[in-house]
């Protein structure tokens, strides 16, 4: 009987197997904790992005109301309201460059306008305005409004990530590249560009040059200036109409 009882005894679990089971259980707990932490982080980030969007919307509305109020006050006093000098331009290359001077080629390269119907944002200052004058016969440019900036970035926005052109389908892509500058989402990127913020250069360099479509209805006269009924040169606020036709 004793022999039968000994046979029925459950064999002891090897120590190595116990250790494996412990390690597996610990690993599972770590993974669950990490997953939970990531979930909470995503939730917190979504909330932050929502709050930022609300704040920017309020800021844009305030800017618009201030402009309206200033114009109204000027009219009331019998004066003309002169808005502040624009700080932002959107530049579109409209012509090829066969046979042009090396200087024009160089400026177009600096503006990152390597192909016809490429577009880029430019911070306006004395140096950049001089550059635009040099290449004016080959570009159409003007002052984009908030709607244009918004639609360009949302519809045609690509980022330069590891020297590759990547579609901005996720805020995480922006956060990874520009998070160190406090830019973590599309709304941050749009705000930095539109207001020409302190990190405009980094935000603008992150954006790949926009590849626009040929304008609906075609172009009138590429070689003639806009003020003479053509397409080239500074069209001020009218650039927004051209953007609509090409976006």
Curated annotation (Swiss-Prot):
Gene3D superfamilies in alphabetical order = Ribosomal protein L30, ferredoxin-like fold domain
Q: Where is this region: 4 X 12 AA tandem repeats?
A: 7-53
Q: Where in the cell is it found?
A: Cytoplasm
What keywords does the record list, in alphabetical order?
Acetylation, Cytoplasm, Phosphoprotein, Repeat, Ribonucleoprotein, Ribosomal protein, RNA-binding
Quote the cellular component terms of the Gene Ontology held in the record. cytosolic large ribosomal subunit; endoplasmic reticulum; nucleolus; postsynaptic density
| Entry-linked CDD domains | Ribosomal_L7_archeal_euk (cd01657)
What are the BP-aspect GO terms? maturation of LSU-rRNA from tricistronic rRNA transcript (SSU-rRNA, 5.8S rRNA, LSU-rRNA)
Which residues does the record list as Phosphothreonine (modified residue)?
A: 16
Q: What does this protein do?
A: Component of the large ribosomal subunit. The ribosome is a large ribonucleoprotein complex responsible for the synthesis of proteins in the cell. Binds to G-rich structures in 28S rRNA and in mRNAs. Plays a regulatory role in the translation apparatus; inhibits cell-free translation of mRNAs.
Q: What is this protein called?
A: Large ribosomal subunit protein uL30
Tell me the name of the encoding gene.
RPL7
């Amino acid at each position: 009987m004793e022999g039968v009882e000994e046979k029925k005894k459950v064999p002891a679990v090897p120590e190595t197997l116990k250790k494996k089971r412990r390690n597996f259980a610990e690993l599972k707990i770590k993974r669950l904790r990490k997953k939970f932490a990531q979930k909470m982080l995503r939730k917190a980030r979504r909330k932050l992005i929502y709050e930022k969007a609300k704040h920017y919307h309020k800021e844009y509305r305030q800017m618009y109301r201030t402009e309206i109020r200033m114009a109204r006050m000027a009219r009331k006093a019998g004066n003309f309201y002169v808005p502040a000098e624009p700080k932002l331009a959107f530049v579109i290359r409209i012509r090829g460059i066969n046979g042009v001077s090396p200087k024009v080629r160089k400026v177009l390269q600096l503006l990152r306008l390597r192909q016809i119907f490429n577009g880029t944002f430019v911070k306006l200052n004395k140096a950049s305005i001089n550059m635009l004058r040099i290449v004016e016969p080959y570009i159409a440019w003007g002052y984009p409004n908030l709607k244009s900036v918004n639609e360009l970035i949302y519809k045609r926005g690509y980022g330069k990530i590891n020297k590759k052109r990547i579609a901005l389908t996720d805020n995480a892509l922006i956060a990874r590249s520009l998070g160190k500058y406090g830019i973590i989402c599309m709304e941050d990127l749009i705000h930095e560009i539109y207001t020409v913020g302190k990190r405009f250069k980094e935000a603008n360099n992150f954006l790949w040059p926009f590849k626009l479509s040929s304008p609906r209805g075609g172009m009138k006269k590429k070689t003639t200036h806009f003020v003479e009924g053509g397409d080239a040169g500074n069209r001020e606020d009218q650039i927004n109409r051209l953007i609509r036709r090409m976006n």
